[in-house]
UniProtKB/Swiss-Prot annotation:
One of the primary rRNA binding proteins, it binds specifically to the 5'-end of 16S ribosomal RNA. The keyword ATP-binding does not apply. One of its GO terms (molecular function) is rRNA binding. This is Small ribosomal subunit protein uS17. Part of the 30S ribosomal subunit. PROSITE patterns: RIBOSOMAL_S17. Pfam families: Ribosomal_S17 (PF00366).
Amino acid sequence: MSEATYQRKGRTLVGIVVSDKNDKTIVVRVETLVKHPLLKKYVRRRKKFTAHDPMNECGIGDKVKIIEFRPLSRNKRWHLESILEKAV
């Protein structure tokens, strides 16, 4: 299990893997806190990103870091950078 590191410019996001059913592809749910303009309270926003997992090493529930990458398919524009925490 060798870790490939990609030092590229672009955004990095941290999220939880919610699906790993496709080959070499994971779906990562990223949560952000955004201040509501009218209510002035923080609201949790969730968004799903499809990322490339070249060695199929992620499982559901893993906390991962993904990095912006060139388009690999219609929806895949992110690449797995590292696994921060494995699920139990």
